[in-house]
Amino acid sequence: MATDEHATPTGTGTTETAIHGTVAPGFEAVRDAFAGNFATQGDVGASVAITVGGDLVVDLWGGTATFDGPDDDEAGVPGVEGDWQEDTIINVWSTTKTMAALCCLMLADRGELDLYEPIATYWPEFAANGKETVATRHVLSHTAGLSGWDEPLTMFDLLDHDKLVTLHAAQAPWWEPGTKSGYHAISQGYLLGEIVKRIDGRSLGTFFAEEVAGPLGADFHIGTPASCDSRVARVIPPPSPLGEEGADHDSIAYRTLANPALTADFSWRKDWRRAEIPAAGGHGNARSVALCHTPTACGGTAHGVTLLSEDGVARIFDQQIEGPDLILPLELNMGMGFGLPGPMLPVPNPRTCFWGGWGGSLAIIDVDAQISFSYVMNRMGEGTTGDLRGAGLLLAAYGAMMA
């Protein structure tokens, strides 16, 4: 692969955005689509990476990491300034969920966690208030009925794992578990994190660092250390905040998204970075996301690292729910922790799974083609689980594979 310094006009048409990195022969269309995101889709700083059969065939980055938003003198950490670099990382929001799911799948593969067993087997207090039969599979598929909290919360409560899991252990489900999906936008991570901790003894972030990121050499963090601060870019908030403004305040959607009403700039805080928020607080770039999922794409093993057996990979595709979601205005087709092919993921291969993050980040695993794909950016769009920028890059990648 050759280093690429291809320059393409940005969305303003007045400056040029240099695209850096490498592309394997035949994947030049991905580079062109990536440059096009800056030219026509308003990208500011971003990265895209693809592995095929374990080989890194696309590893591109470009734009600027600078965002001149205000700093919080007490708790804020200035974002990195200047060009988006090879090692720039950023909060990827719900793309983090794919890492949390991977940790649970690994424990299931080792026989330590039964995804169909009641959570109360591992976490006895969780059985309270009618949750005796709620299983980990329900949390992974957003069907547990615990998409939010009864008690009013602030954004600072999101930094307190123990408080949030204690509240959920005592709370009744908002709907009959297993019957419908309702996107557990923030809550999923705390629930999975507590399950992992009860079984393994380590926090989910520590488990991930020691069992996934460390062995693979992947620069992805759930609980980002201060040593990374000089490389962390700040997200550029979307035009509209996350939430259901004007919606029925008694609706499940409003109760989920407005308690608390999370704003993107809260992720600029150092206490957010340090906290383990497994549904929304992971920091990485496209290369690290793609690398973390490369073993799964290759049947469980890549680069000498085995994360899952073939049966463990197959467990992802155990469909749990398909139909309209109670929170997102979408039809969800959910397996174990990942979305499956359907309206949200129109791809050619059936053993493909995905999830994306608020504002546009995206992770795709195609086991049939052994593809691991990721797109990560700083300028957030309106979407909650990815957007057209990542989709366009994915289409270019499949086009290259089929050429």
Describe these PLM feature segments:
Residues 27, 61, 83-84, 98, ...:
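Tryptophan-centric aromatic hotspots in well-structured domains and transmembrane helices
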Residues 27, 89, 95-101, 133-136, ...:
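Short alpha-helical patches at coil-to-helix transitions and adjacent helical residues
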Residues 171-178:
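Cytochrome P450 catalytic-domain "roof"
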Residues 110, 142, 171, 295-299, ...:
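Generic structural signal for alpha-helix termini and adjacent loop/cap motifs
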Residues 28, 34-35, 54, 90-117, ...:
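Active-site SXXK
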Residues 179-185:
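Cytochrome P450
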Residues 81-82, 86, 91-95, 99, ...:
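Active-site helix/loop module of the DD-peptidase/beta-lactamase fold
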Residues 2-73, 87, 180, 197-215, ...:
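Catalytic loop of the DD-peptidase/beta-lactamase superfamily, centered on the K-T-G motif
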